[in-house]
């Protein structure tokens, strides 16, 4: 788990609802380390968490002692994303991490994802059924059907893609029609 950071579809699964924001972040920050009988969160750590939360621009930096269960789904997902990237994993897995969010919040979490990935030079794999998001984010797009890769595109070809191109490619390769829910 030290080399993998992950954010799942359900905003409720990435955090401990009855714990505070800083307690959740402390657990994530200590992933892979021995835990002794010291203070739960030091002043230095608290300041580090405050600065990291400030970067999210959600007003959470002044709510470190707030229970995570009282936050919105988008706020929880943003914290989960931050927690997953605290230890700079070799791979950040984003498994439909915006599917349970409203469009405005999903867009904000995607922008935060892009920012965190870029600033920390992380390798990320985002699983999504949203074709627009698949095209707009990342530098490579892999389309799968029934457990196998049916399309793999990157570079200029990916930049020039449209949703209609992906749907046509799916129909061509799979022999079926794609039910687009977006």
Language-model features: locations:
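Conserved beta-strand-loop-alpha-helix hinge in the C-terminal portion
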Residues: 148-172
């Amino acid at each position: 788990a030290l080399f993998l950071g992950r954010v799942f579809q359900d905003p409720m699964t990435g955090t401990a609802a009855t714990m505070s924001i800083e307690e959740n972040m402390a657990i994530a920050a200590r992933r892979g380390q021995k835990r002794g009988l010291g203070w739960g969160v030091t002043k230095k750590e608290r300041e580090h968490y405050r600065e990291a939360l400030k970067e999210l621009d959600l007003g959470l930096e002044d709510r470190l002692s707030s229970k995570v269960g009282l936050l919105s789904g988008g706020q929880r997902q943003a914290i989960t994303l931050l927690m997953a990237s605290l230890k700079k994993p070799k791979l950040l897995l984003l498994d439909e991490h915006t599917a349970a969010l409203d469009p405005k919040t999903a867009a904000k979490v995607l922008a935060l994802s892009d920012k965190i990935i870029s600033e920390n030079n992380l390798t990320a794999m985002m699983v999504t059924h949203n074709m627009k998001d698949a095209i707009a984010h990342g530098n490579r797009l892999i389309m799968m059907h029934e457990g196998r890769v049916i399309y793999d595109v990157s570079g200029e070809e990916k930049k020039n893609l449209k949703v209609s191109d992906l749907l046509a490619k799916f129909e061509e390769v799979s022999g079926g029609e794609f039910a687009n829910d977006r």
